[in-house]
Each structure stands twice: as C-alpha cells, then as structure tokens.
Amino acid sequence: MNNENSVIEQQVAFVKSLIAENPGAVIAVATYTAEEFAELRKGENYTLFKQQERKFAEALCRAGVPAERVVFVEIVSVGYYRFIAERKMELGEASRSAYAAWLNNNR
C-alpha cells in the first residue's frame, strides 16, 4: 500500500506540473495502459481499476487540482478515447502533448 501511495503521489505531482506548464489546458490522465484495458475487456479486474482511478481522483482533489483541469480517459484503441468525465471534452494540442508525456513517464 505504501508503494501504491508513492506512485499516486508521483502521478499527482506530474499532473500538477503539467497544469502549471500548460495554462488553460485540460490534462487527460489514464489510470491504466492499453494492455491493461485489453484485460478489462475480458471482464477481469474492472473493480480494481475503478478503485485505482477513484484513489487517484481523490489524491488530485486533496492536492488542490481543479476538477475542470483534468479529465480521465480509458484507452479503447489507438486514436480513440472514451471520456469518463461528466461532460465530454475535446483535447487541445497542449493536452495531447501532456497526455503523451504522462503515458511515456508511466509505462
């Protein structure tokens, strides 16, 4: 659990830095990879992943990250995202770059 909290803290710090570097951008974050999503499609571990997503969202909230600056995404296939926000948003160029950076730093 301690290691899990450390990872979440690192992810929160990274999202906060992206927000600071990209004023006005909406940052897209995912709590699992495309490979993990393939497992979800088989019906495995869905509850576990949703719990991880909730923990991350709660950590972002505690860290003072504005909800309107972050949208959670599930990777469905290359180039297509199913948004898990209350409203759907189109990602601007800065957010696409931030999302790519987040994925690269969390493989």
Where are these regions (language model features)?
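Amphipathic protein-protein interaction modules
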Residues: T47-N104
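Extended, charge-biased low-complexity segments
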Residues: N2-Y46
